[in-house]
């Protein structure tokens, strides 16, 4: 770690104009991005007496080894460039309001021939439209249960759909009229798409249009003396009313607005966002993040403020609000534009769906950045922040602090939710943080390290009698798993033909991990100047293989095993010149810690927090490895006898299995039977027959 005085810019060299600055570590990785009205004034704060800095800021300046800056023409441009660089470099000391992947959503697979509605958690996919997020999983399922009475669209998986299509009879939902049963042709593709349109239109907020239509249809059915249909439509309206009851009107003027409030303590901040559309609460989201060191001082703890008292204003709130507004709406617009492109591609590919997409509420910049944004406090640099929001929306934005009436009352509700979120987070975190800090401190002492380890990596090998040999690499930072940095490997050199050498496998995985790390360091340019591109312009791999996120070296590298495994990994370290990583082995039987070259292991007390953490990391590596091994083994066992037949592609294999029902039944078929399948001539049918029977 570098002493800040070693890279402090010379006096007078820092400009006084607005700009954006980057701190880099010794591997040239960007670890912090900030903006300033006056670069000299802001950067000078980082190089004062380090004992006066906030602990997080102090950690950052010691982790850095250089600082760079870019002068811009205005504060608005500085705000935009800061956001772009945070997206581009993903600096570890910046606050990032990432979407919580655990929020439940209601999804509609609009890209399928027969779209389906389903409960969903996780990152967004192409060709799927999302509604939510919801605060609870049961809320999604209850909404889906009620609305499928009115809009009986498909909700089953592809496998269930195909099975009932081949059986020629619908599932239970088809019999109780909660699915239109497109699998058996009860409705056409166009008719099912109309049902989907009604569902998505309702979920998009066009509720009045839906209820008016149902009322008109019910009255028409009654006039025609079709009382059975009228009763069914009445039940549909009751189901709609139940859904609407859960979305009570909170603003009588039908406002579209987002309401945003924070609760803070000395180190962390919780933010809550309520999405109001048409005067109703349509969504709610929350995050808890660490405060950046720039403004994480000894400030007000909102969770201890007595109810009803006017809280002191946290000086960090305007800065937090500015960061959140730019990041949250910048990400939302980027996501909306991506989804719009995907929808356009679907329309182009399936012209019959064009009407359906036009009927559905379009996802536009104006729909994700509402006209009105109600905030707890005015953001820092309010005028510049408002300009950025207006550019994102493409129209005017009114961002203000509500002072009275329903909007003020709703803001107080959002504030209470933010306080409760922070309170629950702190209650959960207190025990965890104390134990993690003690564990890292004990590890530092037991392994004679200069500082407590920030990042720990562990690898494990998994196989059954030398088959499907794989390895895992898990990463823990501050004693918590960092799953975005997990890796999995197929062992190549040290295994094959039914044999495996665990010691050689450890050496191979260690070499692949740290060879890549060295290559990454060599590949980083000396400096990266902003070229006008945005984060979305760059190609980023969807899987967690982004080299920039993987290049941070661990302070401790754990191999699962004893002295032989440690010795093998140490040989690789010596070969690659790795000297700044502590290597240890954790033997399963007695939980002994083996160090390179030491004849005796280190024994930690059984009640040691450090031992518990090491066990947790080792067990996580084992879990991740064995999960991957099972996937590989299952994949190998699913290999069909049809795969080895030349000239038989995936689509034709699928057609054969679909026609005959299974490979076993296909084996009973004659050449003539096979030639009756669409796309199979006598020559190919004979090749299939011979291929199947030659394998006996």
Curated annotation (Swiss-Prot):
Is-annotated flag, keyword Ribonucleoprotein?
no
Q: Which GO terms describe its cellular component?
A: cytoplasm; excinuclease repair complex
GIY-YIG domain segment(s): 16-95
Q: Which UniProt keywords apply?
A: Cytoplasm, DNA damage, DNA excision, DNA repair, Excision nuclease, SOS response
| Regions that span the bilayer | none
Q: Where do the UVR domain residues begin and end?
A: 208-243
Which Gene Ontology terms describe the biological processes this protein takes part in? Answer: nucleotide-excision repair; SOS response
The molecular function terms of the Gene Ontology recorded here are: DNA binding; excinuclease ABC activity
Entry-linked SUPFAM superfamilies: C-terminal UvrC-binding domain of UvrB, GIY-YIG endonuclease, RuvA domain 2-like
- The lineage's top-level taxon is Bacteria
Cross-referenced Pfam families, in alphabetical order? GIY-YIG, HHH_5, UVR, UvrC_RNaseH, UvrC_RNaseH_dom
> Subcellular localization, per the record?
Cytoplasm
Keyword Cytoplasm present in the record's keywords: the answer is yes
Q: Which NCBIfam families does the UniProt record give? A: PRK00558.1-5, uvrC
* Family membership noted in the UniProt record: Belongs to the UvrC family.
Assembly and binders: Interacts with UvrB in an incision complex.
User: What role does it play?
Assistant: The UvrABC repair system catalyzes the recognition and processing of DNA lesions. UvrC both incises the 5' and 3' sides of the lesion. The N-terminal half is responsible for the 3' incision and the C-terminal half is responsible for the 5' incision.
Q: What name does UniProt use for this protein?
A: UvrABC system protein C
